[in-house]
């Protein structure tokens, strides 16, 4: 896995976690 793809994967998973946190907080 190259670094660019890994970074994109981390960014995506981070965004999903952020959405989950926002959803849980409501």
Curated annotation (Swiss-Prot):
Family: Belongs to the metallo-dependent hydrolases superfamily. Adenosine and AMP deaminases family.
Species for this entry: Oryctolagus cuniculus
Protein EC: 3.5.4.6
Source species, domain of life: Eukaryota
Enzyme class of the recorded protein, top EC level: hydrolase
Keyword Zinc tagged: yes
Subunit structure as annotated in this protein's UniProt entry: Homotetramer.
Cleavable signal peptide: none
InterPro entries for this protein: AMPD
Example GO BP: IMP salvage
Disulfide bonds listed in the record: none
Catalysed conversion reaction: AMP + H2O + H(+) = IMP + NH4(+)
Cofactor note: Binds 1 zinc ion per subunit.
Protein name: AMP deaminase 1
Cofactor: Zn(2+)
Keywords: Hydrolase, Metal-binding, Nucleotide metabolism, Zinc
Gene Ontology molecular function terms on file: AMP deaminase activity; metal ion binding
Membrane-spanning segments: none
Pathway annotation from the record: Purine metabolism; IMP biosynthesis via salvage pathway; IMP from AMP: step 1/1
Keyword Zinc: yes
Role description: AMP deaminase plays a critical role in energy metabolism.
């Amino acid at each position: 896995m190259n670094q660019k793809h890994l970074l994109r994967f981390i960014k995506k998973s981070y965004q999903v976690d952020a959405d989950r946190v926002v959803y849980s907080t409501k």
